[in-house]
C-alpha cells in the first residue's frame, strides 16, 4: 500500500485515473474488468475519496458484496457519522437481519444512522433510507430487498447516506470558494490544498453544487494529460546513466535508502529519481497522518474525478513542461538541500519519539501548520489560513 502510494505521488497522478473509462487487461487471459453502471458513475469520486472503494474496484464492483466488505463499509459510514457529533439515541435495531442481500445491506447501513437522533430514523430502515433518497428502487418502485446486493449498490447506498446526512446538517468541508457573476456568466474560484487529511471528505454541498453548475473546470495542471505526465516522469528521472547516489552525499543517500525500505521498497528503489522529485514527494508524505483517507485522494484529484465523471470540459492554466522545467532547473545544491529538509520531515513523522529532538520539532511544527491550514480551509476562513500559511 505504501509503495503504491509513493509511486502514484511520484507520477503526480494520485487516483487521477478514477474515471469511468474501460481498463485494459494485462493479459488476454485476465478477467474482464467490472465497470460501474452509468447510473453509478457520478458516485465514484465521493466513494473513492471516502474509502468506500479502492484502486482495484474494477475487480469487484459488480460482484455480490461479501460480509467482510460490508463490515468495512459500515465502519467507514460509522466513522463519518461520528464526526457530525449528532445527539445519540438508544437505537432499537433488535431483529434486523444483516446479510448480503439488498435488504440486509440496508439494515446494516440503517443501524449506523439509528444510533443518532435523526428525523425519520424511528420509521425503520426502508422508510428512512427511501425518505433520504439513499435507496430509490427500480422503475416499478420495488426495493428488491431479497436480491443479492452488488458491491456497487452497497457503495452507492453508503455514499448517499453519508452525503444526505452531512447535507441535512450543513456539514462538510466548505473550502475557499469564491463566486463572481457578470451578466449571464458565473465564475467559481476554489483554492485547494494538494493533499488529503483532517477528514476533509465529504466536501460541503456548496462546493459540489458549484461543480455541478460549471461547464468548464480548469486546474493548475490537467491531470488527464497523459503526454504531459509522461514528460514529467522523464524530467523526474536520470537519463544520462547516473543515479541518485552520484548526485547527493553518501549520508543523505543512506537516509533515502532507509526511507525506501520504510515504504516497502528495495533500498535502491529511488535510484532513478532526481532529488527534487523525491523532495516534493517526501514533503507530501510527511504531512499525512491518521486523518488521511485510505486512498490519500488530494482535493484537486477529487475535483478532477468528479468533473470528468460528470462530463465537464477540463482545462488547465499551466503545463507539465512548464512546471517540471522549473523544478528541473534548480541547482544541484538547492535540490540536495530541498531533499534533505523534506526527508527530515518525513523521518520525524515516521520515527515519532524515536527521532532526535530537531527532527521531532520539525515534524511537530509541520503537522501543526498543515492541521491549522486544513481547519481554515474546511471552515472557509481565508483570514485564518493567511495567519498560518
Which residues make up each language-model segment?
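Extracytoplasmic Gram-positive cell-surface binding/anchoring modules and repeats
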Residues: 26-78, 88-123, 134-161
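Sec-exported extracytoplasmic/periplasmic mature domains
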Residues: 49-52, 75-82, 110-114, 130-134, ...
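Solvent-exposed, polar/charged alpha-helical surfaces in well-ordered, non-transmembrane soluble domains
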Residues: 41-45, 68, 72, 103, ...
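Structured, acidic catalytic/metal-binding patches in enzyme active sites
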Residues: 176-389
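Gram-positive cell-envelope targeting signals
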Residues: 1-27
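Surface-exposed patches in mature extracellular/periplasmic domains of secreted proteins
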Residues: 56-60, 168, 267-273
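Hydrophobic, helix-prone linear segments
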Residues: 28-57, 64-94, 305, 309-315, ...
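Short, low-structural-confidence N-terminal segments
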Residues: 26-30, 168-184
